[in-house]
């Protein structure tokens, strides 16, 4: 949208449509981020600036939604907030809605953070990323989200407690640099590689257990 600078990209596949929202980029986007007045939207109170951006392109996005297919809403920073608002607008009418956000700011007014029944709802947070912690006074994340936290010590934690995140938090420089998408990409690749290695270990253990059982069976049969 040329007035709000809101931008979305749509990739259509055979069984899933991916709708990705662009994050903060222009001066208008910054004004959006600081407009924290709550307004009613999607059956709850939401961050007014995010709602303004989302509403400016939502009708265009609706034209591309196919209820017969899975839909993944995703985005980084401001784009993550717009993706979350999209899920809030559609989950009651459409099945198979999925949400993955990166460094997403809080957009639901506290007290109006009703859970959403999505296929999956993941919010990725990279270490000290300050944007993913704000605005804090009036707003919070959806109560049904799963947080994948890329800790500063190199570990990956699912739904860490507030104390853990507070202790893990770095200095001012880290709070800025950890918000960059490049950092998220690096940590995601690391996480997926660790999952791949872990899956191989499980497969190897199962194969070893099977081989051990077959050896025992052969010995019993021969005795």
Model features per residue range: what roles?
Residues 1-74, 78-223:
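Non-catalytic, mobile gating and regulatory segments of ester bond hydrolases
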């Amino acid at each position: 949208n040329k007035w709000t600078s809101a931008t979305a990209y749509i990739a259509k596949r055979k069984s899933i449509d991916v709708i990705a929202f662009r994050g903060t980029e222009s001066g208008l986007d910054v004004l959006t981020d600081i407009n924290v007045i709550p307004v009613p939207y999607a059956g709850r109170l939401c961050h007014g600036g995010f709602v303004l951006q989302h509403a400016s392109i939502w009708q265009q996005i609706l034209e591309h939604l196919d209820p017969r297919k899975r839909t993944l809403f995703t985005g980084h920073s401001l784009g993550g907030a717009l993706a979350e608002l999209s899920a809030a607008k559609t989950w009651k009418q459409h099945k198979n809605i999925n949400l993955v956000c990166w460094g997403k700011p809080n957009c639901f007014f506290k007290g109006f953070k009703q859970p959403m029944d999505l296929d999956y709802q993941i919010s990725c947070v990279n270490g000290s990323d300050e944007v993913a912690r704000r605005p804090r006074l009036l707003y919070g994340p959806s109560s049904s989200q799963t947080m994948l936290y890329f800790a500063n010590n190199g570990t990956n934690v699912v739904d860490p407690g507030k104390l853990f995140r507070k202790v893990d938090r770095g200095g001012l420089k880290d709070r800025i640099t950890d918000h960059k998408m490049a950092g998220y990409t690096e940590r995601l690749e690391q996480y997926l590689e660790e999952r791949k290695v872990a899956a191989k270990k499980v497969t190897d253990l199962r194969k070893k257990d099977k081989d051990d059982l077959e050896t025992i069976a052969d010995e019993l049969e021969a005795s």
